[in-house]
């Protein structure tokens, strides 16, 4: 899980990536390719 300053680049990497907001943080979750998981504080 990477910590990124901005998630625009993370979302563009894979078509299955979704940006989810939980507890004031933005998460990228990717079911088909889990190595793209990221969090933005």
From Swiss-Prot:
Q: Which UniProt keywords apply?
A: Ribonucleoprotein, Ribosomal protein
Please, one GO biological process term?
translation
GO CC field: ribonucleoprotein complex; ribosome
Pfam families attached here? Ribosomal_L36
> Annotated Gene Ontology MF terms?
structural constituent of ribosome
Has UniProt tagged this entry with the keyword Ribonucleoprotein? yes
Q: Which domain of life is it from?
A: Bacteria
* InterPro entries listed in its UniProt record: Ribosomal_bL36, Ribosomal_bL36_sp, Ribosomal_L36_bact
The UniProt similarity line reads: Belongs to the bacterial ribosomal protein bL36 family.
* Protein name listed in UniProt: Large ribosomal subunit protein bL36
**Annotated organism of origin:** Vibrio vulnificus (strain YJ016)
């Amino acid at each position: 899980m990477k910590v990124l300053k901005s998630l625009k680049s993370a979302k563009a990497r894979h078509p299955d990536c979704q940006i989810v907001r939980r507890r004031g943080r933005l998460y990228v979750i990717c079911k088909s390719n889990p190595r793209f998981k990221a969090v933005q504080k």
